[in-house]
């Protein structure tokens, strides 16, 4: 199938409430459609983001939080580079249900717009790919990422 360039034309960007967003992701994850759409759209952000981490870090035992992990696309890329101390959180249980079982040590449903339930300096790295977008995670979440 030909790659699509949809930019910000996806209906998800028009949704306003958390309930609308959760319902959309529930429907989008059916029959693994989300993952197939990411392939069809040539979504390379997870691979590109992990390549930056690989370029600037040499330790493979870093404690990493994949914030807004979705179906685990960033975690999969991290595993390819031998990172294994990875936790993931996402707002959508439907997305989390599609995560391969061997990617994350801990996987939790959580709203990133609320204070995170982690101690200060709990992680060496917080990766957040594709979540700071229309109607999703707000800028104040960055303060929490820095704290943890």
PLM feature spans:
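A short glycine-rich, Lys/Arg-flanked "PGG" loop and its adjoining helix->strand segment in the class I
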Residues: 139-148
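Conserved alpha-helix/loop element of class I SAM-dependent methyltransferases that forms part
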Residues: 43-62
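Class I SAM-dependent methyltransferase Rossmann-like catalytic core
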Residues: 31-44
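Conserved acidic residues
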Residues: 62, 105, 124
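Class I SAM-dependent methyltransferase SAM/SAH-binding core
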Residues: 65-116
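N-terminal, positively charged/glycine-rich alpha-helical extensions of SAM-dependent methyltransferases
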Residues: 1-32
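A short SAM/SAH-binding and catalytic strip from SAM-dependent methyltransferases
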Residues: 113, 124-139
